Amino acid sequence: MSVATPYFDQLFADNEDPWAFRQRWYERRKRALTLALLTRPRYASVFEPGCANGELSAELAPRCDRLLCCDTASAAVALAKMRLLGFAHAQVQHSRLPEQWPTGRFDLIVLSELCYYLDADDLGSLIDRALASLTDDGQLLACHWRAPIDGCPQTADQVHALLHQRLGMENVARYHDCDVLLDLWSRDHRSVATHEGLR
């Protein structure tokens, strides 16, 4: 069973940064790795579900023409909206996934610290929706903490294995260590050097 919305509401009830995104070097380093893994300097339309308080969102915003974020916790949505006030092209919605997947096409979908909260059925549904909304050259980036989390139906390793199996896209970039998994899948298999005419 996927983790229910009240769990996330409680996390944000009296804490604007329940995972210490702003304080922990681990989190700052992970965001830097996430951004470095992206093979394009800029994207047309990015979707970041499970945006929490918008710390990663604020670093994705300068890299795209349109940014859509969402979260299931009302307080997180309010915090992310405040964090993104300086970006007119960014929008934050209150929605629960996979049921309330947005309309539109995206050339980048970022699943950061989200998918292990979903059970296998909901994750499968999310993958189907992601595939349907990715552009012909679209990419999907996944980033997850590897240690088991109490109450989560899946681990990072299970999530990334299922993503790799179900997406049917080439894994064009990855970073794995004992703490975190980062994977980028793309419908465009060309490397950064190939894009820039270096090879």
Predicted features along the sequence, with ranges:
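Class I (Rossmann-like) S-adenosyl-L-methionine-dependent methyltransferase catalytic domain
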Residues: 1-40, 45-49, 53-104, 118-132, ...
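Hydrophobic adenine-recognition pocket in adenosine-nucleotide-binding enzymes
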Residues: 114
